[in-house]
């Protein structure tokens, strides 16, 4: 209810001039609200069961960003500077070590595939994590890379049987929205 109220208030203040938007827009707006509620519920559950705390959103990795570029020396003496933006950075501090993970929000079905990394593909998240590890981040000491995760940000569509109970349906929804990636093995 609260999320819908916030969305509706934002919509009225910023996106309309008071006129009706039509049934199709109303439907899409309700779907957006449901998606936001699903994502917020997952975030609340995630942080209730984790030592990680979100510490940065849209973190800039750039020569003038909060974290410097990730630099790769080239054979000709030049330098390849990789820059970008991290959706979310989480930190868990334990025994003087700052465990850092980067999270990328995905509206599609992106899955982490180590084979792609092996062949030099889909390395963006790892490079961002390495930039934070190598260049430092705020006042965190003894940074240890803890992982990269893709987080689906969609309201999952699940196929159900007519007589399926709510618990089974919720389990299917959770399976479709589970974060995936690679994490440090404790």
What are these regions (language model features)?
Residues 1-186:
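Structural signature of nuclease core domains in nucleic-acid processing machines
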